[in-house]
A protein has these predicted regions:
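Charged interaction scaffolds used for protein-protein
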Residues: 20-89, 136-198
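Long, charge-rich alpha-helical interaction segments
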Residues: 114-152
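Alpha-helix initiation and N-capping motif
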Residues: 5-9, 28-31, 97, 115, ...
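Generalized protein targeting/export and membrane-interface segments
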Residues: 74-75, 83-118
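Short, hydrophobic/amphipathic alpha-helical patches that form generic packing surfaces
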Residues: 10-17, 32-40, 120-128
């Protein structure tokens, strides 16, 4: 979801009446799914788009997608529990919309690199640290202590953490198209809220 303004969250905050639900704390895939379904109830269950045929990368064709067919896809290999070594593991939580915006758009600290921001997101998404039989809530540690923990991970351990993020659930829908010029069939995958409003 590549939006800086609060239009989506403003709509959700006005529509979600359940006490205790903080829209800013919801994972981005939940926000996208909720917004898409609110949009469906508001202006219609179908979305008309123009997509590019994958066989030639040029021909554009109109398609209609029905919102109730769009799902949040959770890959089978995705797991919130990450085994770091024989004794230590992490339980992760999904980044909230606020964390997503801060890591992708926050420019307050110009000196902070992409790597720094990535480490900060990982540190913020740690929920529980397990060491043998002991468990610690990450929130009981300072932001700097969590960041130090992330920075001391070796490359193999960090790849496991990266897998958590790369396989996170996401709004996704695959449509089949036929190129009217070549008659070739192809699949187009739409992912994330922006693809459904292109």
């Amino acid at each position: 979801m590549c939006i800086r303004d609060s239009a989506v969250t403003d709509v959700l905050k006005k529509c979600i009446l359940t006490r205790g639900i903080k829209v800013d704390d919801l994972p981005t895939f939940d926000i996208e799914y909720l917004f898409l379904n609110i949009r469906a109830k508001s202006i219609g269950e179908d979305i008309k788009l123009t997509v590019t045929c994958p066989d030639d990368g040029e021909t554009k064709v109109p398609v209609t997608i029905y919102v109730d067919e769009i799902k949040v896809i959770r890959p089978k290999e995705h797991n919130i529990d990450i085994v770091l070594d024989d004794k230590m593991s992490l339980r992760m939580k999904y980044p909230s919309l606020n964390q997503f915006i801060e890591s992708n758009f926050d420019t307050e600290d110009e000196a902070e690199t992409i790597v720094d921001k990535t480490f900060r997101v990982v540190a913020d998404c740690m929920d529980t640290i397990f060491d043998g039989e002991d468990a610690w809530e990450a929130k009981d540690y300072s932001a700097q202590e969590r960041l130090d923990f992330v920075q001391q991970l070796n490359s193999q351990q960090y790849k496991k953490v990266e897998k958590f993020f790369s396989t996170m659930p996401k709004l996704s829908h695959t449509i089949e198209v036929v190129n009217p010029n070549t008659k070739e069939k192809g699949s187009v995958v739409l992912e994330g809220l922006a693809d459904f409003f292109a």
